[in-house]
Amino acid sequence: MTEQIRIIDAKEHVNEEVKIGAWLTDKRSSGKITFLQLRDGSAYFQGVVSKADVPEEVFSLAKELRQESSMWITGVIHQDSRSHFGYEIEVRNIELVGDSHDYPISPKEHGIEFLLDHRHLWLRSKRQFAIQQIRNEMIRATFEFFNNEGFIKMDPPILTDSAPEGTTELFETDYFDKKAYLSQSGQLYAEAGAMAYGKVFTCGPVFRAEKSKTRRHLTEFWMIEPEMAFCHQEESLKVQERYVAYLVQSVLDNCAYPLHLLDRDPEVLKQYTKLPYPRITYKQAIKMLQDAGMDVKYGDDFGSPEETYLSDQFDQPVFVLNYPKTIKPFYMLTDPEDDQQYVCADMLAPEGYGEIIGGSERETDYDTLKNAIEHAGLDLDEYEWYLDLRKYGSVPHSGFGLGLERAITWVCKLDHLREAIPFPRMINRLKP
């Protein structure tokens, strides 16, 4: 009986007859031979249908197939040195499963809004396939890294009655007889987890009602948020750089084909696996920007132009340390050497991609944290449980958050975050 395989496993079946369930992405014909470009969700390769080797009805069907028709292909696997994938199938039989009429995304160029309107179909393209393969690998590597480091996965709630970074930019919803919010971050809950289990990480969706149309913003995205008890900032920075280097190395090891489809140079990515990453302070960053003629001063937050410039100055990801209190959230630890700034850091990705990680050591003192919550204009009652963590065995602890789509955008060298998630949500995009 002919074995059913996936395209990605073709190398293990050279000169064997196999059966593959596939979709047609494109085709071309040269008289007595029809070339079928096939995909099955694991890879892409070519099917060759020769008029001399198949029944007339099979050759006629091959010539009539429409883009995105689904079928069973039976044939013999051969090596194909002309393609990067390296293999093709000599077709012996075609069984049509599902026809496709007037597929809207033809091989011609389409505008971005058209493609986003048809995102459910755009995902089938080679480029989107490659991006999602790399996204999958980075999620897999995330779990592997933190499991190896002794962390446990913790799942924070999505519906909350409080916000870790203030009540602006929140999506509000009715929750029976009260208001609830879609979570901006799982960090506060991860801190509770760290006090219980030592080292935890979260991986899930978060929501920001930011009315921003930049290439770096989505209203729904995924965050990886580790939290570590008995951990100071220096130790956290080392975990952060090891984690990012691990992600990049995992993509290099396991995603050569997707990287090729994206024309992403592996040699460039390799330099991001070298540790340690450089560090500068916020004050040094301000001076660098001012020396470059940019209109910034101490106390300003960095936007895309500033982050792009700073990250362009380094060949690796770079940490920017110790931001002023006025531009960071209330829960961070005050710098013992400068009470106007926090013990915190952002990691900026090179090639102009900007922030991919934000992290800090957390405030451990009950009264100091209580005052910070009040100073931020937040309701103490909503944070009573969070303050409890400082009443019952408070310890030094640190954590950080990596924006998954930002990291994917950098690793894949994309122009916009919208391609880094299957169905992007933006200020003007809620479907499909």
Swiss-Prot record:
GO cellular component terms given for this protein: cytoplasm
Major subcellular location class: cytoplasm
Catalytic EC class: ligase
Cell compartments where the protein resides: Cytoplasm
Assembly and oligomerization: Homodimer.
GO MF annotation terms: asparagine-tRNA ligase activity; ATP binding; catalytic activity, acting on a protein; nucleic acid binding; transferase activity
GO biological process, one term: asparaginyl-tRNA aminoacylation
Annotated Gene3D superfamilies: Bira Bifunctional Protein, Domain 2, Nucleic acid-binding proteins
Keyword terms: Aminoacyl-tRNA synthetase, ATP-binding, Cytoplasm, Ligase, Nucleotide-binding, Protein biosynthesis
EC number assigned by the record: 6.1.1.22
Coiled coil: none
Record protein name field: Asparagine--tRNA ligase
Gene: asnS
InterPro entries in alphabetical order: Aa-tRNA-synt_II, aa-tRNA-synth_II, aa-tRNA-synth_II/BPL/LPL, Asn-tRNA-ligase, Asp/Asn-tRNA-synth_IIb, NA-bd_OB-fold, NA-bd_OB_tRNA
Extent of the signal sequence: none
Pfam families: tRNA-synt_2, tRNA_anti-codon
Catalytic activity entry: tRNA(Asn) + L-asparagine + ATP = L-asparaginyl-tRNA(Asn) + AMP + diphosphate + H(+)
Family membership: Belongs to the class-II aminoacyl-tRNA synthetase family.
Domain of life: Bacteria
NCBIfam families hit by this protein: asnS, PRK03932.1
Cross-referenced SUPFAM superfamilies: Class II aaRS and biotin synthetases, Nucleic acid-binding proteins
